[in-house]
């Protein structure tokens, strides 16, 4: 054993003890936790805002910006208190969508489009708040640089609101706080390894303090809504493992609004968070993802009515005619109650109706689902008088006691509207509970997978499961083979494996023999061990990580090591866990298959040799059989060339061999094709030359497969 294992163990020890890249650079504290505050007045205790997300304005798809005129038309009818643009403002990709870069023309288009929306929609520009998404940081080496067009063309930049935390307060009979968080990378790694939001300890603390700020200074209740680009499932923990969810629960926010995942995944990515705080108090909040403008043209109207939060989503494929948003009672399936423990029954029905037409009549009907949805009550609603010119709130009183029920979905509400053109419009039927009960529907598995699984943790599970499996696959069979290789009993056992019918041998006999025979070639086994250890600790490849013509960076399993513009430092472990889009496909689809296929080629080589050996032994006399019994399994297949030179076959037949070998070679070709496909995508993303000149990623898997296929060609009689 001493002759086989010291080298790889020494290499493993060396790589483990080697200083690994560490986070030697962080954003400046002021940038990391800076806060901007804005205060706007409102009338009464009902406020509404509009959210748009994932605009993806593109040079190659001008209709995305042009059709934002539909949003401007809608805003004229809605007249929201705020317009929130939650990230991915520009697309920042080429026409083939294979590489990323910042395009100033897209940002100029965005600025012009917003100016047009302001003129068309009649909204005060200072009430528009936009934040970065991951696409807005593709290829931005540092904030404030020449490629950081958000700092030049965004609405927030025009009002000097470039802090990572934006706090907005609407003040009326109650106070409503909207808090925006920019969790994009300070060093903008290019596509595809820029997928997650990245929180920091200082930013989380800044959010915590800011959510308390207005509460400590207000004499009226404060309802809090937080917005950002990234869902919580795609937001990484801070350096000390802190997360926003506990802060949101502790500060009793009502909802977190986000984008990022697009409507192609689902138009109902909603999640109810229940978290037990340090004081052993259970708190909760909703997380509502809004689908994209890019392909789906989605817009959300969100309202707060006395602390109750509700919303409705619209697809703006054509101009918005009339929108009906029931602000109270809220939908018992997906709407939030500010504090269910302090819930008090309200004898109100409140509805916001946004329309370009004059509204003539509004009524609400209550249906009983336990009685085949028969109408229980029809209630007329009246426009609430207001000092402001545009406050489309309709109200009615009812006896809420009549609708007490043990079921949160027994009673359903629908609103009917008649406008001045005689057009009748109705809202969607939705359940309600006057007691604040909830009936959260079961999510489809795709929604659960993307929106409720914490992908930062899932990455660690998938990554280390793969690495543990790979290390076991390399070392355990080698140890077994080392102990039994010189034993005649092993050679007899190997012969018995082949001589007995397959059905008489259990699968694990074949598996053990396959793994042990696969490790017989010392050069290949050592090469695979050193390669895997290299992937764990050393750089995989080099590339232009932060801009098309920027400095060369290195990608490790733990993230990117990128030269930082100030002080000559290195920003390390950047884009972690974002690199999962590179590492997991490579490990699962290339590295593990390469090892298994190499094992298979050498095991198949041994099978062919043993079968030929048995035929020769059976036809030889007993003396020759006794003389040759000590060399049943040759160390190198090349030795066969000297023993069986009288029956040469063509090189192609020798190379392809049996059907088993042909299947293995076909699998090698498929694995090589997958590998080359992954490499070509990375070449497009980070530069052809540096990727080609990165042997660990580009060349070693192919060389291992080609070498194993060549060395296992068996020359037999």
Where are these regions (language model features)?
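Active-site glycine-centered loops adjacent to acidic/histidine catalytic or metal-binding residues
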Residues: 54, 87-88, 133-134, 229, ...
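Short beta-strand elements
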Residues: 425-453
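N-terminal active-site segment of His-dependent metallophosphoesterases
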Residues: 2-10, 14-104, 477, 484, ...
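Alpha-helical transmembrane segments of integral membrane proteins
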Residues: 458-717
């Amino acid at each position: 054993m001493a002759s086989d294992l010291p080298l790889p163990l020494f290499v493993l020890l060396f790589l483990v003890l080697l200083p690994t890249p560490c986070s030697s650079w962080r954003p400046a504290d002021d940038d990391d936790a800076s806060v901007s505050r804005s205060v706007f007045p409102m009338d009464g205790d009902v406020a509404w805002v509009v959210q748009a997300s994932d605009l993806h304005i593109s040079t190659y798809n001008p209709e995305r910006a042009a059709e934002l005129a539909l949003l401007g038309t809608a805003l004229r009818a809605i007249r929201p208190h705020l317009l929130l643009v939650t990230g991915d403002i520009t697309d920042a990709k080429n026409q083939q969508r294979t590489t990323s870069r910042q395009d100033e023309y897209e940002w100029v288009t965005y600025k012009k489009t917003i100016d047009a929306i302001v003129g068309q929609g009649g909204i005060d520009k200072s009430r528009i708040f936009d934040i970065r998404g991951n696409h807005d940081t593709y290829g931005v080496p540092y904030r404030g640089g020449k490629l950081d067009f958000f700092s030049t063309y965004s609405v927030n930049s025009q009002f000097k609101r470039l802090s990572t935390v934006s706090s907005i307060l609407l003040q009326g009979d109650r106070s409503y706080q909207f808090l925006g968080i920019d969790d994009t990378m300070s060093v903008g790694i290019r596509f595809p390894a820029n997928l997650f939001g990245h929180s920091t300890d200082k930013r989380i603390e800044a959010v915590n303090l800011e959510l308390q700020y207005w509460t400590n200074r207000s004499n009226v209740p404060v309802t809090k809504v937080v917005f950002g680009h990234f869902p919580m499932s795609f937001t990484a923990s801070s350096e000390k493992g802190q997360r926003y969810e506990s802060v949101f629960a502790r500060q009793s926010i009502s909802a977190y609004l986000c984008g990022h995942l697009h409507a192609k995944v689902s138009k109902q990515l909603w999640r109810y968070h229940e978290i037990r705080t340090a004081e052993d108090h259970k708190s909760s909040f909703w997380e509502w993802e809004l689908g994209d403008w890019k392909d789906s043209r989605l817009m959300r109207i969100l309202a707060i009515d006395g602390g109750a939060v509700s919303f409705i989503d619209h697809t703006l494929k054509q101009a918005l005619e009339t929108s009906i948003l029931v602000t109270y009672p809220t939908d018992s399936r997906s709407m939030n109650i500010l504090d269910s423990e302090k819930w008090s029954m309200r004898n109100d029905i409140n509805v916001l109706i946004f329309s370009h037409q004059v509204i003539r009549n509004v009524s609400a009907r209550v249906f009983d689902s336990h009685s085949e949805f028969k109408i229980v009550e029809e209630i007329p609603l009246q426009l609430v008088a207001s000092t402001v010119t545009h406050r489309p709130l309709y109200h009615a009183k009812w006896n809420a006691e009549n609708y007490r029920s043990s079921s949160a979905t027994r009673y359903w509400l629908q609103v009917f509207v008649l406008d001045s053109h005689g057009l009748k419009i109705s809202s969607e039927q939705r359940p309600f509970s006057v007691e604040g009960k909830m009936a959260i529907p079961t999510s489809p598995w795709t929604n659960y997978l993307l929106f409720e699984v914490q992908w930062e943790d899932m990455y660690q599970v998938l990554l280390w499961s793969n690495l543990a499996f790979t290390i076991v696959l390399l070392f355990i069979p080698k140890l077994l083979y080392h102990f039994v290789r010189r034993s005649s009993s092993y050679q007899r056992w190997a012969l018995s494996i082949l001589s007995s019918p397959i059905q008489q041998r259990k699968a694990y006999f074949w598996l053990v023999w396959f793994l042990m025979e696969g490790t017989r070639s010392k050069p290949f086994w050592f090469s695979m061990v050193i390669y895997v250890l290299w992937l764990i600790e050393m750089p995989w490849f080099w590339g232009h990580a932060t801009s098309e013509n920027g400095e060369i960076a290195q990608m490790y399993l733990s993230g990117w090591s990128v030269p930082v513009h100030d002080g000559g430092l290195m920003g390390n472990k950047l884009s972690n866990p974002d690199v999962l889009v590179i590492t997991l496909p490579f490990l699962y689809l290339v590295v593990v298959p390469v090892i298994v296929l190499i094992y298979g080629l050498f095991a198949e080589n041994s099978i062919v040799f043993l079968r030929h050996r048995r035929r020769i032994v059976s036809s030889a006399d007993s003396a020759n059989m006794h003389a040759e019994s000590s060399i049943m399994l040759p160390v190198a297949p090349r030795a066969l060339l000297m023993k069986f030179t009288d029956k040469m076959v063509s090189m192609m037949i020798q190379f392809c061999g049996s059907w088993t070998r042909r299947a293995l070679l076909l699998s090698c070709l498929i694995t090589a094709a997958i590998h080359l496909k992954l490499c070509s995508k990375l070449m497009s993303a980070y530069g052809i030359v540096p990727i080609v000149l990165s042997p660990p990623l580009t060349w070693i898997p192919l060389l291992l497969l080609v070498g194993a296929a060549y060395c296992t060609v068996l020359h037999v009689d």
